[in-house]
Every structure is written in C-alpha cells, then in structure tokens.
C-alpha cells in the first residue's frame, strides 16, 4: 500500500476553498448576511454559532460575511459570545481570529409576530452593505409553532432586493402528514422551492454522502445490489444515553418522529434508489421520491416499541429510567426505542425487508447501514459459513467493511469470519473534513440542495408513518421495557429474525489498524 501523506488542517481547508471558489454558485465577492432567527436558543449557541465560527476560522465563508442574531431576548453580542464561545473549542492562537469573527456579529431584539420588529431588522441589515449587492440566508432555529409568523414577516419585510434569499428550516417538519402539508403549503406560498432548505443534519454526514459513490462508482456492487442477492437491509441508529433531563421536548415527539421518519428513512432512500441521471440536486431527489412512493404504510404487526428502565447494576444516569426523568410526564407511554420493517415494492427490492431500528439508552453509540446477503447456494462446508455483510459505519469511526468467510489457518477447510477492511478513517488519516452542519451550511451558501429534503420527499415520508403515529397517539400502547445499556427489547430481535435477518452473535468488527 502506498504511504499516506497526512494533510494538515490548513492544507485540507485550502483544497476545500479551491473547490468552493471554482464553483459557479459560490459568490465569493458578494456580501452575505447570515441571519440566525432564535439566536438565544440552545441550537444556536451549541451548533449554529460554533459552525459559523469554524467555517470563518478556516476561511470557508465568503470574505464579506456578516452574522446577525435575532430573538425576543434583550441581548448583546457579548451575551451571545458568553453563551456560545464555550462550544467553539478555540485555541489561544485563534484569539485574534475570534475577535475578527465577533466584530462581524450583531444582534437585534424583536418579536416573532410583530411587523415593526422586522422593519427594524431589515434596516439593520441594509446598513451593513449600504446598497451594494447582498445575499441573505435565514436560519430558523425556532420551534415550528412560530414558523408561519416568522416566514410571513421575513417574506414581506426582510428579503434582499439586490441578491438572492435562502431560508433554512430545522426539523421537525410537522407532526404528521396533515401538519407537515400545512407547513409546506404555507412556506411554499411565500418562497420558491429553490429558496427553501429543509435541513436534516444526517444528510451532511460524510458516510451518508459516500453511499452514492460506493453504489454508483463501483462496478462490483451493481450486479449484486438487488433482491436476488440481498436478504435484508438493516438501518441502525443507537445512542448510549437517555434523555437526561431533556425528556419534556422528546416526549412530545418520540423516537419515530425524532429519528426513524427522517434520518433512517433518508438513508434507506440512498440504499434503495436507482442511479440518478446526474448528481444534480433534483435528479438525486427525484430518485429518492420514487423509492418512497414504492413503500406502503407501516404495518403495526411489523413494529416493536420500547421504553428504557433503570439498570439496577448501573452507575449514574444508567440507574434512571425514562419515567424517572423529572421533565417527562408521569406515566408517559412515549417510545424511546422503535424497530420497524418496511418493504420497497419494486422490481429491484420486492420481498426484501428494510429493518429500521433506533433507540436511546442502548449499549453503544452507533449509526450504520448493514446489507446482509443471502446464503451461498450449494453448501459444501457443513453449515459453517455465515452470511456475507456489507457495513457502512456512519458513526463513530467511519468505516466501510465487508464481512466474509476465509479459510482458518491449518490443515483443514475450516471457514471463519473475517473482513475486507475499507476503514475510512485510516485511508484519510488526519484529514479534517467539515462536519455535518458545516457541510450543509456551505451547501446553502453554494445553492446546492442535494442534501436537503424536498417537499414531495417530506410528504411521502409522512404518508408512510402517519397512520402508525396516529394509532400510537390514540391507543397509547404500553412500550416494552428494556434495561438502560442493553441492546433493546428482545422482541425487536425476534421481529428481525422473523423477517429473515440472521444474527450470529459470533463476530465483532475490530479495527486492524488499532491492534
């Protein structure tokens, strides 16, 4: 293997800048104003301000970029700095750059439903570029309850008259098909689809984006990526921690709305879709919509719901169950774990189960796509062979590996499980790539919508899950208890086995570069 040359962060950012500035859509010379609606909130201080700082620090933003915070709270830039800077991870050497960054920040206080407040915000932004061409990006870091008032006032009062306007909308995009359609219809009445960026940060993950290249740039996968060779597909999202005092928000939505209906379903689309005509945003999203249209509504017989309980042998938070969280309503039946089986009813995938599973307070932090292949026909090894699997590990330790059988060293033909290792982190050692939020915000600056959710995608996703969600909301079935730190309810394993997944439990991936 050729020796890998480690790139410094400066070199990597230089390559990224070159890629960005060569693109037609990245208007480096223009003034850009990035407006954070809800600047006083948790999302803004923990994610958005740090992300904009990292992009500014690494020279990835257009040079003449201003950041404007807007919220109801009477704050100053110094207040915003005190709240958000602990999440910046800035080094002492970066202090001068940090001062430059905050010199480009300003803050405007105002109500979300008051037209006069937006006139004041617009006057403030106009003063920043004094009549020159300026583009405006509005990030709605707000609860959906105020979306309608905020978007209406932005459209009527705060749109740039000399450049483009783009609006970033955070999930949840509604609670069901009806509320999502209502929100989509409202926003679509104010903005064109090419101005709307519905952000699902999982679509910014490197390995999620890598799915398309793996599938369509490698000849070896094309002939086997179908129902004749693949027995089942498992899409997993596991967190090792519970709600930890933040259960009030989670209880309103639950694990299906929070993770399954968006993150996991988007990954399913990338696994199942046909090759798009090009990598243009709409070509890719057209193929994803075709997949969603082939999926029927989830059947309750193919769903397992769970809720974690305290581990009597655990320590700290692990001793607390979901209902022990003081912010969770007493007796709540909200699921913190869900497994569901979907079927893509088309020629390529007919009969192949797509198993979606996600949960909190589980045994590990992991997000992955696992394709389990069918048994080898004509077994000559006396049932010693396990099924091949292709695993795309999204987090942690980004990796792609194939579980396969090889001969065990010795005199006899004894097969054993091994892996063909394509560990991403080792191949690109020391390469610091933008994280999901950095990548997606750069996409908005560039006008690329490939990794954002289109209105028809959203509609189909809610169509699939809304009947199940309504049934759960109305009947409030008792979720199956599972112990904090476990693999989840055993009933989920039984469901997976019933639809065709074979869990051997004899193999664990080991990063060979850390041995």
From Swiss-Prot:
HAMAP family: G6PD. The modification N-acetylalanine is found at residue 2. Pfam families: G6PD_C, G6PD_N. Keywords: Acetylation, Carbohydrate metabolism, Cytoplasm, Glucose metabolism, Hydroxylation, Membrane, NADP, Oxidoreductase, Phosphoprotein. One of its GO terms (biological process) is ribose phosphate biosynthetic process. InterPro entries: G6P_DH, G6P_DH_AS, G6P_DH_C, G6P_DH_NAD-bd, NAD(P)-bd_dom_sf. This is Glucose-6-phosphate 1-dehydrogenase. The modification N6-acetyllysine is found at residues 89, 171, 403, 432, 497. It comes from Cricetulus griseus (Chinese hamster). Coiled coil: none annotated. Cytosolic glucose-6-phosphate dehydrogenase that catalyzes the first and rate-limiting step of the oxidative branch within the pentose phosphate pathway/shunt, an alternative route to glycolysis for the dissimilation of carbohydrates and a major source of reducing power and metabolic intermediates for fatty acid and nucleic acid biosynthetic processes. Its EC number is 1.1.1.49.
């Amino acid at each position: 293997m050729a020796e890998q040359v480690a790139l410094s962060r400066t070199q990597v950012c230089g390559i990224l800048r070159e890629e960005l500035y060569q693109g037609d859509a990245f208007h480096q010379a223009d003034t850009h104003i990035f407006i954070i609606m809800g600047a006083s909130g948790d999302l803004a201080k923990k994610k958005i301000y740090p992300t904009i700082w990292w992009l500014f620090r690494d020279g990835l933003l257009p040079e003449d970029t201003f950041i404007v915070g807007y919220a109801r709270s009477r704050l100053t830039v110094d207040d915003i700095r005190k709240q958000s800077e602990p999440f910046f991870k800035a080094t002492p050497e970066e202090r001068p750059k940090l001062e430059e960054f905050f010199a480009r920040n300003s803050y405007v206080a105002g109500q979300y439903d008051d037209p006069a407040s937006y006139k004041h915000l617009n006057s403030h932004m106009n003063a920043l570029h004094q009549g020159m061409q300026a583009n405006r990006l509005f990030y709605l870091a707000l609860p959906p309850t105020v979306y309608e008032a905020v978007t209406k006032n932005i459209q009527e009062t705060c749109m740039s008259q000399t450049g483009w306007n783009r609006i970033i909308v955070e999930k949840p995009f509604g609670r069901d098909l009806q509320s999502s359609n209502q929100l989509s219809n409202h926003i679509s009445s104010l903005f064109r689809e090419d101005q709307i960026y519905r952000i699902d940060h999982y679509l910014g993950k490197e390995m999620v984006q890598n799915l398309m290249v793996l599938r369509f740039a490698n000849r070896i996968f094309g002939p086997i990526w179908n129902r004749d060779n693949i027995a089942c597909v498992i899409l997993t999202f596991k967190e090792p921690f519970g709600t930890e005092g933040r259960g009030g928000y989670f209880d309103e939505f639950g694990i299906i709305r929070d993770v399954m209906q968006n993150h996991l379903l988007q990954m399913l689309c990338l696994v199942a879709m046909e090759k798009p005509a090009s990598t243009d945003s709409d070509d890719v999203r057209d193929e994803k919509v075709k997949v969603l249209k082939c999926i029927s509504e989830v059947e309750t017989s193919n769903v397992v719901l769970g809720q974690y309980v305290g581990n009597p042998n655990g320590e700290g938070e692990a001793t607390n169950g979901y209902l022990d969280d003081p912010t969770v309503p007493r007796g709540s039946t909200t699921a913190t774990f869900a497994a569901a089986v979907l079927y893509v009813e088309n020629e390529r995938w007919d009969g192949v189960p797509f198993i979606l599973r996600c949960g909190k307070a589980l045994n590990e932090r992991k997000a992955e796509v696992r394709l389990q292949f069918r048994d080898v026909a004509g077994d000559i090894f006396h049932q010693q062979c396990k099924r091949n699997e292709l695993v795309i590990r999204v987090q942690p330790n980004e990796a792609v590996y194939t579980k396969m059988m090889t001969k065990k060293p010795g005199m006899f033909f004894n097969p054993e499980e091994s892996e063909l290792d394509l560990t991403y982190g080792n191949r690109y050692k020391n390469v610091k790539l933008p994280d999901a939020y950095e990548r997606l915000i750069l996409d908005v600056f560039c006008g690329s919508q490939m990794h954002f959710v289109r209105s028809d995608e959203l509609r189909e996703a809610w169509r699939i899950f809304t009947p199940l969600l309504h049934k759960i909301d109305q009947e409030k079935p008792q979720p199956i208890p599972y112990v904090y730190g476990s693999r989840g309810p055993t009933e989920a394993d039984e469901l997976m086995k019933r639809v065709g997944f074979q869990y051997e439990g004899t193999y664990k991936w080991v990063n060979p570069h850390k041995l």
